């Protein structure tokens, strides 16, 4: 399940391969072929941690992203073929790329940290049912925010008899292919909560 979350773009493609028909099935097969070529290039550079390898991975990402961002793969109002932003075909490329780019860092590869999408800890508060229950059940509540990709550490917080698992991000990344003012403000607020 964890590995599946890291290969979120591949999973998106495979889901579409199972359900699409007609022209979209033809399109998603084209994309799958190009995806496999892209991953093969990344895998050839897997052991390389130098700047040139990172640049090459980014160049390969741009080439693949340009391919799937062709107008024929994007659904417009009067067209039945292609995919909208809601299908996440285009946005999941960046999420998966973060995993491929960072998984080779030795200090992240020892099982001490998690890589991938998470519900990140943003804050906690206490909301007991009443004053009397506060002694036994302080009503520990943890707020979390979905993050597209993070390097995180799971920790357990125990207060009284309550115990909660929380994910503390060391690095948290929100991948956006389009960002309006409302989304920007939301991202800034989330970043502020996670950092504090």
Identify the residue ranges that each predicted region occupies:
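Acidic-basic catalytic patches of nuclease active cores, encompassing PD-(D/E)XK
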Residues: 75-145
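Surface-exposed cleft-lining segments at the edges of enzyme active sites
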Residues: 84-87, 173-179
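Short acidic loop-to-beta-strand element that houses the catalytic metal-binding Asp/Glu
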Residues: 137-139, 144-159
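Conserved catalytic cores of phosphodiester-cleaving nucleases, focusing on short active-site segments
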Residues: 149-151, 168-177, 187
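Acidic, metal/cofactor-coordinating or nucleic-acid-engaging core segments within structured domains
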Residues: 178-196
């Amino acid at each position: 399940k964890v590995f599946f979350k890291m290969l979120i773009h591949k999973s998106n493609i495979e889901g579409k391969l199972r359900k699409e028909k007609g022209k979209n099935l033809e399109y998603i097969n084209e994309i799958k072929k190009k995806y496999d070529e892209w991953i093969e290039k990344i895998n050839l550079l897997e052991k390389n941690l130098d700047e040139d390898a990172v640049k090459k991975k980014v160049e390969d990402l741009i080439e693949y992203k340009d391919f799937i961002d062709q107008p024929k793969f994007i659904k417009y109002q009067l067209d039945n073929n292609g995919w909208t932003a809601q299908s996440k075909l285009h946005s999941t490329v960046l999420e998966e790329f973060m995993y491929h780019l960072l998984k080779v860092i030795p200090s992240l590869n020892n099982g001490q940290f998690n890589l991938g999408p998470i519900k990140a800890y943003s804050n906690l508060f206490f909301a007991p049912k009443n004053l009397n229950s506060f002694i036994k059940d302080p009503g520990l509540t943890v707020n979390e925010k979905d993050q597209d990709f993070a390097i995180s550490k799971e920790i357990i917080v125990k207060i009284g008899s309550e115990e909660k698992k929380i994910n503390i991000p060391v690095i948290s990344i929100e991948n956006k292919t389009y960002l309006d003012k409302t989304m920007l403000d939301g991202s800034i607020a989330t970043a502020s909560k996670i950092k504090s």
